[in-house]
């Protein structure tokens, strides 16, 4: 009996090793060698307040604003106004009290099927295209792809990612700024502050089903085991990056959908960019685009492929800054 058990154990280990090798080969063969940084001709422009086309700037240009806010939006015509009102009210008040403070809000319509762009353009007309810009993508790329398009078209010294649902209280950007400041001195002007909901975990568990709680813990384990160490909440959509950190990390980003946050932080840790995790005020907002089981399954696959593709060299990091 003992011999049989040892044989079965050996067979199990061999099958697991063979499966890992097979998955690694598939991950390597199917990998895109370079991040898909393509732009449709229509995506190289934004519409100003008069409805005229203007060319978008580049992340590699020198910054002309203190803060850029990138808002990825997919079918957000109903939730976007609440977020935009809160954000712009805060930013306008801050500018009124500090005349040196400058900002821009970039709404990236990720191929929406509703009136998201039209809703966003109303804010452009109200505040002017120097403060509010709308980029309309020709097709849906995914949240990561939309954020990257906004980041690459930003003008800020610091770049804030903020979800269109307004789940995080916008004034908490000051907490992220404090988190960045506490990381100084920044190596090569690079640092990241991540908004975190980890302090709300016990409360959220009490409101979730056992199945969703199991999925959440499983995802957290895979993130820790495969990709990112030391960050309890990788998925909060409220993140602040220095311009150099944004340029370096997003230049190497491959994942365009929900797991892009994990790859972003994985890249940052590989580049030894300091990261602060900062507790923020967050509220569950109805209308999430995340389908619990299938989205978590997709993210689990993405996590495995992130690790294997970097490990096998199918994906590599961009180490140098693009010349201006």
UniProtKB/Swiss-Prot annotation:
It comes from Mus musculus. The chain crosses the membrane at residues 8-28. Its main location: endoplasmic reticulum. SUPFAM superfamilies: Nucleotide-diphospho-sugar transferases. GO terms for cellular component: cytoplasmic side of rough endoplasmic reticulum membrane. Belongs to the glycosyltransferase 2 family. GO terms for molecular function: dolichyl-phosphate beta-glucosyltransferase activity. Pathway: Protein modification; protein glycosylation. It is found in: Endoplasmic reticulum membrane. Keywords: Endoplasmic reticulum, Glycosyltransferase, Membrane, Signal-anchor, Transferase, Transmembrane, Transmembrane helix. This is Dolichyl-phosphate beta-glucosyltransferase. The keyword Membrane applies. Its EC number is 2.4.1.117. Residues 1-7 are lumenal. One of its GO terms (biological process) is protein N-linked glycosylation. It is a single-pass membrane protein.
């Amino acid at each position: 009996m003992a011999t049989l058990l040892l044989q079965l154990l050996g067979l199990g280990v061999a099958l697991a090793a063979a499966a890992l090798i097979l998955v690694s080969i598939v991950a390597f063969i199917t990998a895109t060698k370079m991040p898909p940084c393509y732009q449709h001709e229509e995506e190289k422009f934004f519409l100003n307040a008069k409805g005229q086309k203007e060319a978008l700037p580049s992340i590699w240009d020198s910054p002309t604003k203190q803060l850029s806010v990138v808002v990825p939006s997919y079918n957000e015509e109903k939730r976007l106004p609440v977020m935009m009102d809160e954000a712009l009210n805060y930013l306008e008040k801050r500018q009124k009290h500090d005349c040196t403070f400058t900002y821009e809000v970039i709404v990236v319509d990720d191929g929406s099927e509703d009136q998201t762009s039209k809703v966003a353009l109303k804010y452009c007309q109200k505040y002017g295209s120097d403060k509010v810009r709308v980029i309309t993508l020709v097709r849906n790329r995914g949240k990561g792809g939309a954020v990257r398009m906004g980041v690459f078209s930003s003008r800020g010294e610091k770049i804030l990612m903020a979800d269109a649902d307004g789940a995080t209280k916008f004034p908490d950007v000051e907490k992220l700024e404090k988190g960045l400041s506490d990381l100084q001195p920044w190596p090569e002007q690079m640092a990241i502050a991540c908004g975190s909901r980890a302090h709300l975990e016990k409360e959220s568990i009490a409101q979730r089903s056992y199945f969703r709680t199991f999925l959440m813990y499983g995802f957290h384990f895979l993130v820790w085991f495969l990709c990112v160490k030391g960050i309890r909440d990788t998925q909060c959509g409220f993140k602040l990056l220095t311009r150099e950190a944004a340029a370096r990390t997003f230049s190497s980003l491959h994942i365009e959908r929900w797991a892009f946050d994990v790859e972003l932080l994985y890249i940052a840790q590989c580049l030894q960019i300091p990261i602060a995790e900062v507790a923020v005020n967050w509220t569950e907002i109805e209308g999430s685009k995340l389908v619990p089981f299938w989205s978590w399954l997709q993210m689990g696959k993405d996590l495995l492929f992130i690790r294997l593709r970097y490990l096998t060299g199918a994906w590599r990091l961009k180490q140098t800054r693009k010349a201006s």
